[in-house]
Every structure is written in C-alpha cells, then in structure tokens.
Regions:
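The feature marks proteins involved in alpha-glucan
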Residues: 2-73, 109-117, 121-217
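Structural beta-strand segments of beta-rich domains
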Residues: 74-78
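Short proline/glycine-enriched turn/loop motifs at strand-loop junctions of beta-rich domains
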Residues: 81-88, 122
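Short beta-strand elements bearing conserved aromatic residues within extracellular beta-rich modules
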Residues: 88-90, 127
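Ser/Thr-rich low-complexity repeats and stalk/linker segments
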Residues: 101-109
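Substrate-binding/active-site clefts of carbohydrate-active enzymes
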Residues: 198-361
Length: 361
C-alpha cells in the first residue's frame, strides 16, 4: 500500500540512535530553502520496530516461575516487550482480591526492547503493569494494563495471574501422561464438528445446573450432549473445533444474564432483535471473536471466574473428557481480531506499544 511512494533510508550508523528516537513521537518533515515546514507527517513505526527488535522473538515473555538456574533458586520472572516505553512497573498483589502491596521497576534490555523483573512473587499472586509511553498527539501517558501474554487472569480480566502451568494444582487427575486420540492419517480425512462451549449445555436439563454453559459440562458422560458426541465419534467424527475459549471481552465473567425476550413477539421480528441488543452488555452469550488475552482461558465458562487457577484446571478437564469420547480438540484462534485499540479500556496491545500491532484507517 506504500509501493508508489518515495523511499527514504537512514544512514547505517543511526541504527542504535533509532532505538531511542522511536521512544518519542517522530515526524517526517519537508522543509523549503527558507527553513519553513512545507509538509509534515507522523511515521508508521511497525516496520522499524520489526527490523530493530527481531531478536525479541527468542526470549520467553510473560510470567515464568520455578527454579532459575542462574540464581540457583526458585523465583518469578516477568517479561514484557515494550520497546518504545519510557518506563514499566509491575504492581504485585498477594492474591486475586488484595490491593497491590508492592510496586517494582522493570529493567529494559535495549537490544530486545524487553522489560523484565525477577523476584519472589508466589504462584497465586496477581499483577498489572504500569507502562509509561509516548502517545502521538497526546504526549507521555501512564497506562495500567494486564499482561498480554497472561496464562490466566482474575474475573473480568482485571489482573494477570502468576501461575506455572506445570503446577500439579492446575492438573486434573490423569492429566500427566494423558494422550489424545490418534489423528487421521491425512488431514483431508478429518471430520470436524464446530461447537460453542456455552451453547453445548446451557439448555441441557441432563447437565447439573451449576455446570450448564461451563467447561465442566463436558465431564458428565451421561448427558444428552455427551452421548450425542460419542455417537458422532463412533460414526466417524474425528475432531471438535471449539469456538474461542481464550479470554474475550464481551461477556461479563460474573453476573451475566440471559436476555428476557419480549413475550409474544415474532421470532424474526425487530422486537426480538431490539430486546437482545438492549441487554447485550450483560448477556452471557457471545461468539468470542473479540480477544483480550490469547493465551488465557475465558473465565465465564469456569465455575469460579475470580480464581485464576479454576479456569485452567476446568478447561483441561473438558479437553480430557472430549478425548475420552474419542474426539481430538482444536480451538479457534483469531489472531487477526482484537477487542479494541488505542486508549480504550479493553485495548491491551495498543496501550503497550502504540501504533505497532494494528494498522488502522
């Protein structure tokens, strides 16, 4: 889309200086012989950041816990890629409810653009980041954000969780050593059934009420839904394709409701649509194509959205149950979607590295 434009290049010896220049708003200006600005435009920095920080794809990002060989002790490490940030801090809380008790300053690696901190935050603690970054047209702002690489969160994505996915407390009985069914020899022979977690069981009276619309609905082998899936597997179905089960924005993870539709209205009439839209902000249903955190399970499908460990454990239980029915499990990943951009409260990536992740008109 820029192919017809003029190409300008910086001298090779400016590469290191460019790392610092990109931490402030940059403009390209055309200046006439009298020193007057004729034209001015902000720069699109994504390509430059890719060129400068390609090595940032190698180190692990997010949270790592456990034995750290360099220090010969157990520790927690937080890592965030924010190459244009002026400062990054982490606000640590001992659990999902307590206010932040510690604020720590992350250190920047100028070659990778990764900010990191290592300390003694225990599994089960929670955190958010404070990212100080220049916003074009605004100036320096401080954004409180969750970790885009979170593996789990508290209710409504308020805080990221310090978890080790290898922790036995997150592993259902039988998880270690568990094997999924063998796949089809050729991909063309896969038979895939697309399924929405909530819709699978929300209205199934054979599922215990507290598990309807939840991950744990799959663990009840004698329900209408699971009997149906086993029958499909016996008939040749090979794979379940789950609509998004990563953390998404549009369903309140606590206190969501099922819309009360207008009595007597035509099913295909405008009254029904208006009734649903009027209650959309609290509706328990959404397809989930508005990701907040790609690597964390959605909390509205868990029996306790407030406890970050529960959603991880229960999603694993659901996967094991589907494998037990003879079905492999895949997940719809929509990396071309985000819930929001800019300074919106449900924008995560764009409030960490403004202008990098999304190309907007």
């Amino acid at each position: 889309y820029l192919g017809a434009g003029t190409t300008l290049r910086l001298p090779p010896n400016t590469r290191e200086a460019l790392r610092e220049w990109l931490r402030a708003p940059l403009q390209l200006q055309q200046i006439d012989p009298q020193g007057q600005v004729v034209r001015s435009t902000p720069l699109q920095v994504a390509g430059a950041l890719d060129d400068l920080y390609a090595s940032a794809t190698m180190p692990p990002l997010g949270v790592q816990t456990g034995f750290m060989a360099a220090q010969r002790r157990s520790a927690t490490r937080l890592s965030l890629w924010a190459p244009t940030a002026a400062q990054v801090q982490a606000c640590l809380s001992p659990d999902e409810k307590a206010p932040a008790s510690t604020v720590v300053l992350l250190q920047r690696n100028s070659q990778t653009g990764i900010w990191s901190w290592q300390g003694t935050a225990m599994p089960g603690s929670t955190y958010t980041y404070l990212v100080d970054v220049e916003l074009p047209g605004v100036g320096l702002v401080r954004n409180r954000v969750t970790d885009p690489y979170s593996v789990s969160l508290t209710a409504n994505s308020a805080r990221s969780a310090v978890l080790n996915l290898d922790d036995p407390a997150l592993q259902p009985i039988g998880w270690v050593g568990h094997r999924r069914p063998a796949g089809a020899e050729y991909a063309v022979d896969q038979r895939i059934y697309e399924l929405h977690v909530r819709d699978f069981s929300a209205n199934d009276p054979s599922v215990p009420a507290e598990h309807r619309g939840k991950y744990l609905a799959f663990t009840h082998a004698d329900t209408y839904g699971m009997r149906h899936l086993r029958a499909l597997a016996q008939a040749g179905m090979t794979d379940i394709h789950l609509l998004p089960v990563f953390d998404f924005a549009t369903v309140p993870e606590t206190g969501c409701t099922t819309p009360a539709l207008t009595a007597g209205a035509r099913a295909d009439g405008p009254e029904i649509q208006a009734s649903v839209m009027a209650q959309a902000a609290t509706d328990c249903f959404n397809w989930g194509y508005d990701p907040l955190h790609y690597n964390a399970p959605e909390g509205s499908y868990a029996t306790n959205a407030a406890d970050p460990a529960v959603r991880v454990r229960e999603l694993r239980q659901a996967i094991m149950a589907l494998h037990g029915a003879g079905l492999r499990v895949g997940m719809d990943v929509v990396y071309n979607h985000t819930s929001a951009s800019g300074q919106h409260a449900q924008s995560v990536l764009d409030r960490i590295v403004p202008g990098y992740y999304q190309r907007l008109s």
